[in-house]
Amino acid sequence: LAKEIVGNIALVRFTNRIFEPLWNKENIESVTITLNEKLDVSMRVGFFEKFGVLKDVVQNHMFQLLALVGMEEPESLTSDAIGIAKAELLEKVAFKTGYLGQYEGYLQHQGVEQGSKVATYANLEFEIDNERWHGVPFRLITGKCLKEKETVIKIKFKPVKCLLTKSCPSDQNELRISIVPRAGFALELNAKKLGNGNEVMPVEMEYCHECIYGLYTPLAYETILKAVI
């Protein structure tokens, strides 16, 4: 949560006129937050047998990201004001549906109880009971021992009405905020395809944080230590 790009979420929302007016149930179809890891939990079996993936990353890291996306505009962009806005939002969050899983081989780790049902994977859907978000699914997906390490927020906008195009309806706009492995964000838009006619295709406008700042980007723990000092 101390990563530079995470601090960018509120700034992207509230300092860009093109986003905040669209940040609601009338324009957004769904929000999906994914936090996948390649490593297994063989070195953390004692912790995982007690708490599982829900208490490992869902109740803290993922809910914090959900709150940053869903909160109302804070009085200011100070940490205290943002904290209040996030807390108010989380009071409105309710579980809707979902399922849990466990990666193959977990039961073979030393220290795992025989027949353990501890979850190492979660695919959960929540709803937010307020005027802005009523009816919009917020999906949290996370797991251990997966193919790719990735933390990303995908905000999918509702499709536009059918126009006189060959591809109808056209692809939906999507804002993607990538935290790991490559920090940055991208906005997928529709544009005219080369040639005659009115066929459209998805194009991407991308901001790559590491491409610009590279080694100058402070590490997450570095940010925390500076705040403490």
Feature map (PLM): residue ranges:
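Secretory/organelle targeting and membrane-embedding segments
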Residues: 2-229
